[in-house]
Amino acid sequence: MLKIKNLTKVYGDKKAVDNLSLHIRPGEIYGFIGHNGAGKTTTIKSCCGILQFEEGEILIDGTSVKEQPLACKAKLAYIPDNPDLYDFMTGIQFLNFVADIFKVGAKERQECIRKYADMFESFCC
């Protein structure tokens, strides 16, 4: 599912992630534990395509984050500890906004929103 090969991310003259390799197979659960500045968030953001990295390769289900970032973003999500939500939008408006960014068609969008609204027992559409 997730394969990281020799990941290196540098900020200025500081290596935030230095030659990290990791393979997480389907069904496995991993946690990133470490002190502030250890590279946990940088690694996760790199996996999600939010941050560019200098060296290495990240594959999501065999798809390269560098070569096909949108395909990878469709399979993986990142929820930050301080999400930047738009206070002027409802939840449904925000989901439609994100669907617009990723060019999700109207039919698929409605199906997905309904599916997850039902799953989480939320009011929908």
Please provide the spans of the model-predicted regions.
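Short coil-to-beta microelement around the adenine-binding A-loop and adjacent beta1/P-loop entry
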Residues: 14-15, 70
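Walker A (P-loop) phosphate-binding loop of ABC-type ATPase nucleotide-binding domains
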Residues: 35-39
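Helix-to-loop junction immediately C-terminal to a conserved catalytic motif
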Residues: 48
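Conserved ABC transporter NBD signature motif
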Residues: 56-67, 71-72, 76
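Conserved ABC ATPase "signature" region
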Residues: 96, 100, 107-125
